[in-house]
Regions:
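Amphipathic, interaction-prone secondary-structure segments
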Residues: 31-77
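Ampiphathic alpha-helical segments that act as solvent-exposed interaction surfaces
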Residues: 2-27, 81-114
Length: 114
């Protein structure tokens, strides 16, 4: 794994942790539970995977170093319990850290407020 990829992963992860900390009260008000599913860092790949659960649906936020997936660094998906259409956001190979964080923030806010 390239050092540049790991640095980008770490920057995204750090900002996501801050974003969730800033939304902690709002998550609590909306009875949304958070579970850290995976927090792995090694020489080959890094994973930080969070699940959010409410009485309306479940969400998974994944941050990884690039590997063979439909996204590059980040993925956010929501599955609604009332069978509404699922929500997906995937970054692209040329997405900047700022773009990724903006879209993850927007996605998490959408889940919290729905």
């Amino acid at each position: 794994m390239e050092l540049k990829e790991q640095e980008k992963f770490l920057k995204i992860k750090k900002e996501v942790v801050k974003m969730i900390e800033n939304k902690k009260e709002k998550l609590k008000e909306n009875n949304i539970k958070i579970d850290i599913i995976s927090d792995i860092m090694n020489d080959e790949e890094n994973f930080y995977i969070l699940d959010f659960e409410s009485d309306k649906g479940v969400t998974r936020l994944e941050i990884t170093t690039p590997h063979f997936t439909p996204y590059y660094y980040a993925c956010f998906n929501i599955l609604w319990l009332n069978d509404d259409e699922a929500y997906w956001w995937l970054d692209e190979e040329n997405s900047t850290v700022t773009e990724i964080l903006k879209n993850l923030e927007k996605s998490l806010t959408y889940f919290i407020n729905s």
